[in-house]
Amino acid sequence: MSGSVAVTRAIAVPGLLLLLIIATALSLLIGAKSLPASVVLEAFSGTCQSADCTIVLDARLPRTLAGLLAGGALGLAGALMQTLTRNPLADPGLLGVNAGASFAIVLGAALFGYSSAQEQLAMAFAGALVASLIVAFTGSQGGGQLSPVRLTLAGVALAAVLEGLTSGIALLNPDVYDQLRFWQAGSLDIRNLHTLKVVLIPVLIAGATALLLSRALNSLSLGSDTATALGSRVARTQLIGLLAITVLCGSATAIVGPIAFIGLMMPHMARWLVGADHRWSLPVTLLATPALLLFADIIGRVIVPGELRVSVVSAFIGAPVLIFLVRRKTRGGA
């Protein structure tokens, strides 16, 4: 390990943790109406009854927590996908998991009138799981291992089909379209803490699982044959990773809708900062992705008081950064 990488690693984690704290604080302070820090602190004291305190507790706190949960989930899911598929352009939408969750939620609303948070979460998990199983079955090869190329192709094909069906159902059913149009655009506008409580435990378990897979992912990134020679159980690692992706993507999609680009970009930035070792890149991704998502949400609230969707802002932020990272990597000969 070079000295520059060691120094970067020593700075990256505490620096990103501080950045995440700043993003969280600004998310509570800044919006269509900026509030002083004293009002935010008073709101958390439990004694404030003013309208400003209501804004903090009922509007900004839920969306801030949603950004933290969804950002962490999407970042880890993207990092897992890029390693499992050995495809640097993989993201949470590539394997069709987000599309499966979205399709299930829209289908449940159209056929059964599901509208509560619990019902939508259940449909999201079911859709994500079914999509993952279909892709895993289609992308499997001899010995029960997953072929990265077949896995990627199966995911792209399934995502295209499900996204088309989702749009068709929503457009043909005006009630469903009105109910889910903001969610389909990708937004942190969450007003119910109960929804976040329901997905908190699954996200924490899946996130911890992803972090515990760090060593196995390091071996797998060298190739299946090399990983097997090093004593890694490739099929088990791929299966556990796929299940973690299912839970992370299903939870994030159920909370904030389909948000692209975040899971694609941030793992690249993490590897650029601290190297390809998953023991470092996964924690850095876990800290950096929620921070970026919160900053994107803040920018959307400031630019357009009527709420420019975070998915739009994240795409504008993410595209130039990713292009820079790709060009830098190309010049370095990697």
Swiss-Prot record:
Regarding the membrane, this protein is recorded as: Multi-pass membrane protein
Which stretches are transmembrane?
Answer: 10-30, 64-84, 93-113, 121-141, 152-172, 193-213, 242-262, 280-300, 306-326
From the Swiss-Prot or TrEMBL record, state where the protein is found.
Answer: Cell inner membrane
- Asked whether the UniProt record includes Ligase among its keywords, one would answer no
The principal location of this protein is membrane
GO MF annotations, alphabetized: ferric-enterobactin transmembrane transporter activity; transmembrane transporter activity
A GO CC annotation given for this chain: membrane
Q: Which InterPro entries match?
A: ABC_BtuC-like, ABC_transptr_permease_BtuC
Q: Which UniProt keywords apply?
A: Cell inner membrane, Cell membrane, Ion transport, Iron, Iron transport, Membrane, Transmembrane, Transmembrane helix, Transport
Q: Which SUPFAM superfamilies match?
A: ABC transporter involved in vitamin B12 uptake, BtuC
Enumerate the Gene Ontology biological process terms. Answer: ferric-enterobactin import into cell; iron import into cell; siderophore-dependent iron import into cell
The record's Gene3D superfamilies line, in alphabetical order, gives: ABC transporter involved in vitamin B12 uptake, BtuC (1.10.3470.10)
Task: Give ranges for the Periplasmic compartment.
Answer: 1-9, 85-92, 142-151, 214-241, 301-305
Pfam families referenced in this protein's UniProt entry, alphabetically: FecCD
Cytoplasmic-side positions:
31-63, 114-120, 173-192, 263-279, 327-334
Per the entry, what induces it? Controlled in part by the amount of available iron. Induced by hydroxyurea.
- What does the annotation say about its assembly with partners? The complex is composed of two ATP-binding proteins (FepC), two transmembrane proteins (FepD and FepG) and a solute-binding protein (FepB).
What family does the entry list? Belongs to the binding-protein-dependent transport system permease family. FecCD subfamily.
Q: What does this protein do?
A: Part of the ABC transporter complex FepBDGC involved in ferric enterobactin uptake. Responsible for the translocation of the substrate across the membrane.
Q: What is this protein called?
A: Ferric enterobactin transport system permease protein FepD
